[in-house]
Amino acid sequence: MGKWTRRAFITTGVVAGGGFALGVALRPGHRTPELASLVSKDDETLVNVWVKLDQDNVATVIVPHSEMGQGAQTALAQMLADEMDADWDLVQFEEAPPVSEYANYLLGYGIVGEVPKVLVPTFDGLMLTVAQSMGMQITGGSLSIRSTGQYGMRIAGAAAREMLIEAAAETWQVPAEEIQTKASQLIHSASNRRAPYAEFAAVAAQMMPPSSPKLKSADEFKIIGHDVPRRDIPSKVDGSAQFAMDVQVPGMVYATVQRAPVFGGEIAKLDVSAAKKITGVIDVVTLPSSKKEGGFSGAQNIGETVAVVAEGYWPAKQGMDAVLVEWNNFGQDSFSSDEIFAQFDRDITAGLDRENDRLQGDVGAAIENATKVVEAEYRVPYLAHACMEPMNATAHVHDGECEIWIGCQNPLGFREAVAAALGFEPEKVTLHNYFMGGGFGRRATSDYAIQAALVAAKVQRPVQLIWSREEDIRQDYYRPAVRSRFRAAIDANGDVASWENTYVDKHEPAEAPLIPYAVGSQDIGYVASPTNIPFGPWRSVDHTQHGFFTESFIDELAAANGADPYEFRAQLLRDKPRHLAVLNKVAEEAGWGRSLAPGRGRGIALQESFGTLVAEVVEVTVTDGDVKVDRVVAAVDPGLAISPDGLKAQIESGIIYGLSAAMFGEVTIKNGAVAQSNFHDYQILRMPDAPVIETHVINSGGPVGGAGEPGTPAIAPALANAVFDATGSRVRQLPLKNYDLKFRIEESDEVA
């Protein structure tokens, strides 16, 4: 993938072409008619590439994002439907096919700051060109609502409405400005005429969509900002929803795999004789190692793989257990997690080629003049995604083509990755995307899709490949382990005069280690310390690590200053009104300052991520060293909550996911391989351990933020700070399960 510069973007020649996510319909050539055959049935008319109308006046929104429980497809349909003035009872949605015309612009959106703001609502051609070139149809980064929705679906809905008005005006021979719309109806009061949208859909579809349709103001919204039933819930409740593992193809066989346990390993010796004797086993095949398999993370050290194909999953699993394989690990089978963190420590201390995220003021002078200097070091482990539905895909390769059934976060990217692995043109791969039983970033990487396609090509039969839970835990693209070192100066007035932070390694997003607090001198930076552990996006990416680090350290500074943690933060946020409002709200709703019984504690944390501000207060009870999370209170400012109930659900989901990680989550490396294998040693939060969660939404009117990830980063530091409040023990590394909290230990080997 070549590097896109601002000049390259501008010289694509399509910047001034039209409305953002109306897609190719706004570029020269108007390709809506060409796409109609791809996404429309006989009784449907594609008005523009994102919405179609049928003869019963039902509007179907075509959504270019995958559904993995986050409810984005419903919320995106809300945004289009509101601008279209559609009757919500006559709105449904379907996922866009994985073709370049429905690419999205997740990565391209990062250059918005370099594009004149006047073009932001109308630079579809720019982003579409970038998205197509990169093979992007990504669901991630909490961008579905704040980008596709805000700059795409709203404009598409408004454009469709204007096109339908224009079509009615031409037919009725009346001025367009005299026509009103309401609940999927066109109304001309002067002539007492009324007609459903469907009546003019065919005429509207022949028009060029307007490049800058008029959008509603917030006080005009009828669907945006209101709770509506999620359209995917009923089928998930009654069991009719289709996930990738539900797929059945005539003649289908099953496969399971084992990749080299030590990353980058290759097969040295293979004995499949016992496996082939098991009833139902059809074949045992091998798949090559690879250094590039697509997805956000690319691929690092992907070893060779053994696959057993059988008439059912169970005989495939039995066959895999019977395979005897010796691996060539190329000397990588002697290192451990302890060695990795020791390497991190050496590299931070050496500081070679340190890069700055933020450098301001004079940190050295602040340290020299400090009344008190506070230092601390934190670390977090590698984490697996632990999706409830393990990785799986069904593939059929025949006659120079491939058909694949899968649940993934980047259908277009997966299609291209599978094509490349098979040596096909992308047009020869048909991909059907299904609901996912969890994604969290793991299903943005295409390794499991490629495996299914390669096995199917080898056996020349449809193959459903299913990873075991053990494979799912041990062959993940993990959230990176990080070590982070801090030093701060407190002056004679009790103010934080400087903030220093060095960590390993830099990932995404760039702003994750930055702080919102008013500290004059700051030196925040990182050093490279690469390992051979595959890494990838994990719910809220680097915000989870750095949120824990920075919000724990600011709490330590409050304690060193003898200050209340909430009031200390509030003083440092005096010039950040949105941050302060969220902090004040969570403190108020949590009853901050109210006394707690001995053994109980309360902690607070604040993190801005993906355009959304979240503050959380955690209340815990510590009994005989065991921590019970009793209550979590969250305040969230997303600018505008498109679906308030959906937003709350995502914040609560993020809290539970983050609590699992903070309390139990840990992937450790032993002899070069992952030691954990299943939920007995990679524990997740269970229902009896789940706290009461209260979520309070602030619609500040700021830019629309994300929802799927911002609930996660603040929970770990709030929990750690609550434990300190209850016990006096400062938690500086996770997970919490590794601590013995029966004693008030401020410093120990575990806490260092």
Language-model-derived ranges and their functions:
Residues M1-A752:
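Cofactor-binding beta-sheet edge motifs in enzyme active sites
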